[in-house]
Amino acid sequence: MASIGQGLVLLLLLLLLTAQPGPLKAQHWSHGWYPGGKRSPDSPQDPQPAPRFPEGYWLGLAAGNPRQSTQSLPSKALAPPEDTVSEEAKTMAWWHLQKQRLIQTLLPRP
């Protein structure tokens, strides 16, 4: 008897999980006629065009020739990022964090 009741509960749970309430008005960002987000068909926003790469860029990457593909990039794209934070500011931030840690360890927690 107990297994029949458990089976019925399991069947009802399965039916609840598989039942769909009906079509939804909003679309998921990855589906539908308007890829890119939930928006109405008369939305004034046009999707941005994809960036254009120089001719032969992908061929250079596919052939394993990094020189050919890097020659078409601006020199600033290949340079390492500049560190704009001064050493003094880094030191001050480090001391501030150390002070906070010390206070947290010394003060009793409620």
UniProtKB/Swiss-Prot annotation:
The keyword Signal applies. PROSITE patterns: GNRH (PS00473). It holds the Pfam family GnRH. Residues 25-85 are annotated as: Disordered. InterPro entries: GnRH, Gonadoliberin. GO terms for cellular component: extracellular space. Keywords: Amidation, Cleavage on pair of basic residues, Hormone, Secreted, Signal. Midbrain. It is found in: Secreted. The modification Glycine amide is found at G36. GO terms for molecular function: gonadotropin hormone-releasing hormone activity; gonadotropin-releasing hormone receptor binding. Residues 1-26 form the signal peptide. It comes from the Eukaryota. Belongs to the GnRH family. Stimulates the secretion of gonadotropins; it stimulates the secretion of both luteinizing and follicle-stimulating hormones. PANTHER family: GONADOLIBERIN (PTHR10522), PROGONADOLIBERIN-2 (PTHR10522:SF6). This is Progonadoliberin-2. It comes from Suncus murinus (Asian house shrew). The gene is GNRH2.
